[in-house]
Amino acid sequence: MTTEPPQPGPPAEGPGTGRGLFDKEQLDRCISCGFCLPACPTYSLTGDEASSPRGRITLMRALETGELPADDPTLAEESSYCLGCRACETVCPAGVEYGQLLEQWRDHQWSGPKRPWIVRLLTAVVARPFLLRLQGLVRRHARPSGGGSADGPSLMLGCVERGLYPAVSRAALRLRPELNVPPGQGCCGALHAHNGDSATGKALAEELGARLPGTLVTTAGGCAAHLAHHLGPDRVREFGDHLHREGHVPAGRVTVDGRTARVGLQDSCHLRNGLGVTRPPRELIAAVAEYVEVPGAGDCCGAAGTYAMLRPADSRAVLDPKLAALAEADLDFVVAVNPGCLRQLRQGLRRTGARTRAVHLAELLALAEEDRT
């Protein structure tokens, strides 16, 4: 891609200017300083200004003011090419909430029939749990039973983990059996919000918050960030963060061939960049294994929700340097704290024939307890 966006310029003046697609305050915050460029995975791959946060905000401004027509192909391409990792937010001196702008952009670009068919299918299925059951995607044992009190913290069963990785929730409950698992849980709406339907994403988050009492604990970093945005950070905790705050002391050690296992971490982008949670998973891993900080652990793995399905070649281009770093680190395990990352890493490691295994944080800690017995 070599298409250049309109050159960065001052924001449009005056109230009521533009189409009303974006939060004008957020658009106006961007001062086009370029601090975001090195943090952006797609800009690092292409060196293309249009594929940077600064360039994309310039495109958003051009769409808002009518400088670019709504059907301009660069708008469609760049709104899709962005991973939505929000790494740019952590280095932005102006405090631009880029993730919010991206959701608004995709609300426009992916409205109605313009939404990719696979996104339409997935969002329809996860918003209707009975469809998951009908299609056999949720196994009978996928919903574990917790032993917590009705008004205690609730373990939220993520849509993806419920169907593909039920062992993660079971491991979480072995570690914290006091967690309550209310029946009838629905989708939190993160998938919708990130894929052009932020209104449904908000409604589903609020509905889930009303259905589940107390603190919501989730084993998915992306769900945690989405729920915290709509329900408030005091009501939502990612599982590792919950363990850390509750003073959980991991038991046992993870061993491989009689030695302490070497374990690295793949950060969840939204957990790290959206909620600022970085220490808890590292400290928990270090308590049961030899923790190895892999270069680029905080960089996106290329999963990015539906991105790996919509743009597999671009997703692999983001993942491949990470796979090389994992191989160089000679790990026994790499830990993920988000189901999309877990899937991405497992597929990549399998493709390259690596000996490293990708596991969820809850699974690693449960494995340590098993080794103790």
Spans of features found by a protein language model:
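Iron-sulfur cluster-binding cysteine motifs and their immediate structural context
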Residues: 2, 31, 35-59, 76, ...
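Iron-sulfur cluster-binding electron-transfer modules in prokaryotic oxidoreductases
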Residues: 3-8, 18-20, 98-373
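Ferredoxin-like iron-sulfur electron-transfer modules
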Residues: 10-32, 45-48, 61-84, 266
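Secretory pathway export signals and precursors
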Residues: 26-32, 36, 78-84, 88, ...
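Conserved aromatic-histidine-acidic binding/catalytic patches
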Residues: 28, 89, 93, 160, ...
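Alpha-helix capping and helix-loop boundary segments enriched in small/acidic/polar residues
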Residues: 28, 47-51, 192-195, 199
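Residue-level recognition of short, well-ordered coil/turn positions
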Residues: 35, 67-68, 87, 113, ...
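Short amphipathic alpha-helical interaction patches enriched in hydrophobic/aromatic residues
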Residues: 44, 64, 89-92, 231, ...
